[in-house]
Regions:
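Non-catalytic, conserved peripheral segments adjacent to functional cores
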Residues: 2-113, 132-134, 141-188
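Short beta-strand His + acidic residue motifs that chelate non-heme Fe in jelly-roll/DSBH
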Residues: 118, 126-131
Length: 188
């Protein structure tokens, strides 16, 4: 489903609550302009208010995989993610136990070329892998980082069966991410 709202197209995905935003790019001989975020647009489309409280940015090289991360309970985070430079495969996994898409994932290529963004509601694990030589990844969160509530799922969990688009020998993960549990052993 496509809805064109002012300077941005908003698409529903196969997973309820995850939406793709595609800003309109205005270019001329000076460069380009786009509206990357508009609170009322997202709130109106979702039917509830999202109040982002923290912006984060990471720089990573090709093959770096960060994820799959989430925060538990009242510290869960909704995120609006985008790529400022380069390209990534972005993945959201539905961890909402009352959801008809529990345990399913949605993936999309986000890049500085396509300008697409992904809104991920609370109750999801999130991760991405860098497909380009390097990438600058930016994300807004509606809840602060809370170390005691952080958790995750191993990237290559057989139940989730995520295609990361790169072979395992090209992936770079932190020691911490390599020690994450599998989906079936999660304690939510």
């Amino acid at each position: 489903m496509l809805i064109n709202i002012q300077k941005m197209e908003v698409f529903k995905t196969t997973i309820e609550g995850c939406i793709v935003l595609s800003p309109t790019l205005f270019s001329d001989d000076r460069g380009h302009f786009l509206e990357s975020y508009k609170k009322t647009l997202i709130d109106d489309f979702l039917g509830y208010e999202v109040e982002f409280v923290q912006d984060n940015e990471s720089f990573s090289s090709k093959g770096v995989l960060r994820g799959l991360h989430f925060q538990k309970g009242v510290y869960a985070q909704a995120k609006l993610v985008r790529v400022v430079q380069g390209a990534v495969l972005d993945v959201a996994v539905d961890l909402r136990q009352d959801s008809s898409t529990y345990g399913q994932h949605f993936s999309i290529e986000l890049s500085s070329e396509n300008k697409k963004q992904l809104f991920i509601p609370r109750g999801f694990a999130h991760g991405f892998v860098v497909l380009s030589d390097s990438a600058i990844f930016s994300y807004k969160c509606d809840n602060y980082y809370h170390k005691a509530s952080e958790s995750g799922i191993i990237y290559n969990d057989p139940t989730l069966n995520i295609d990361w688009k790169l072979p395992d020998d090209q992936l770079q993960l932190s020691k911490k991410d390599l020690e994450l549990p599998g989906f079936k052993s999660l304690k939510l």
